[in-house]
């Protein structure tokens, strides 16, 4: 995986310490004792918040064969072993690679791994079900001034956007649980746990209030922008725009020069992110196989 390197710390955090990791699902190919290929397979052993166990679904989050060992049938043997493992665990669907909580990338990079993508679709019958993209923006010269009137209009309508105060955590979590995906709840909770330990700041989460009720939020972790969302009945009123502006400005104030989004759709990219200088950096194919 030449464009997706990881270090040992990331491997431990995202693989060995994942609550769903099962050593039998990490299928490894060796040649004379040396690892030349692998396939990481996962099924849920603990439920995901607001989703549950997904008992019919499994995921492949990483797969690779060493360049010098390719075209010897190793990749096919690994994939056949992976599919057999999923059948043994009574799965009826396998996806590459939108697993939460610890996916590496949304799917197969259509440019960097074009041969692998073609191999998966033609040889093993995977179908492309989505083509999300990653985006990056240089925020050094980002100017929040043009959005001041919009924020003032929201305040006049009773909506205020501000950093999350620790005392408002219960209201914030209640909003997240009621209105946003379970994995976003997890993201926010993990950032708050880091803040409680002194490893992050509560001001890395911006919230929108309507009266005494949280109606939207935006967060960042280093240069990673998002997730962010607004209550469905209040979307289209500029709340998300102001949250995004406040969040990007907070990132600049911390000395960050860039912001990146790992996973979004074309519609969201064009409607929201492009307006703030985000540009596509990678394109992925999310794959699925059913039986």
Regions found by a protein language model. Name each.
Residues 159-172:
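A short beta-loop-alpha structural element at the N-terminal edge
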Residues 47, 71, 79-156, 285-289:
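Acyl-donor-binding surface of acyltransferase catalytic domains
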Residues 27, 37-41, 58, 63, ...:
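Conserved GNAT-family N-acetyltransferase fold
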Residues 2-32, 36-49, 177-214:
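Active-site rim helix/loop that mediates acceptor-substrate recognition in acyltransferases
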Residues 60, 94-97, 225, 259-263:
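Conserved hydrophobic beta-strand within the GNAT/NAT acetyltransferase core sheet
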Residues 65, 71-88, 230, 236-249, ...:
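Conserved acetyl-CoA-binding loop-helix of GNAT-fold acetyltransferases
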Residues 60-70, 99-102, 225-236:
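A short, internal acetyl-CoA/4′-phosphopantetheine-binding micro-motif in the GNAT/acyltransferase core
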């Amino acid at each position: 995986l030449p464009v997706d390197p990881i270090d040992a710390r990331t491997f431990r955090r995202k693989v060995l310490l994942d609550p769903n990791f099962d050593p039998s699902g990490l299928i490894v190919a060796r040649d004379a004792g040396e690892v030349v290929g692998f396939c990481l397979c996962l099924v849920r052993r603990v439920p995901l918040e607001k989703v549950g166990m997904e008992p019919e679904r499994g995921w492949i989050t990483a797969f690779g064969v060493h360049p010098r060992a390719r075209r010897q049938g190793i990749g096919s043997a690994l994939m056949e072993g992976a599919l057999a493992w999923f059948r043994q665990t009574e799965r009826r669907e396998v996806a590459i690679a939108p697993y939460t909580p610890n996916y590496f990338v949304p799917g197969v990079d259509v440019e960097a791994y074009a041969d692998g993508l073609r191999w998966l679709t033609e040889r093993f019958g995977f179908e492309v079900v989505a083509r999300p993209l990653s985006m990056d923006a240089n925020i050094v010269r980002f100017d929040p001034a043009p959005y001041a009137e919009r924020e003032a209009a929201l305040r006049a309508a009773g909506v205020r956007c501000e950093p999350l105060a620790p005392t408002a955590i219960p209201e914030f979590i209640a909003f997240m649980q009621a209105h946003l995906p379970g994995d976003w709840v997890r993201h926010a909770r993990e950032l708050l746990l880091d803040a409680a330990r002194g490893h992050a700041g509560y001001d890395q989460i911006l919230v929108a209030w309507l009266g005494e009720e949280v109606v939207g939020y935006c967060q960042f972790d280093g240069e990673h922008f998002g997730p962010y969302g607004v209550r469905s009945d209040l979307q289209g009123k500029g709340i998300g725009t102001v949250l995004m502006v406040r969040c990007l400005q907070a990132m600049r104030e911390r000395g960050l020069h860039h912001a990146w989004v790992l996973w979004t759709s074309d519609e969201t990219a064009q409607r929201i992110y492009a307006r703030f200088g985000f540009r596509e950096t990678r394109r992925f194919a999310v794959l699925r196989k059913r039986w």
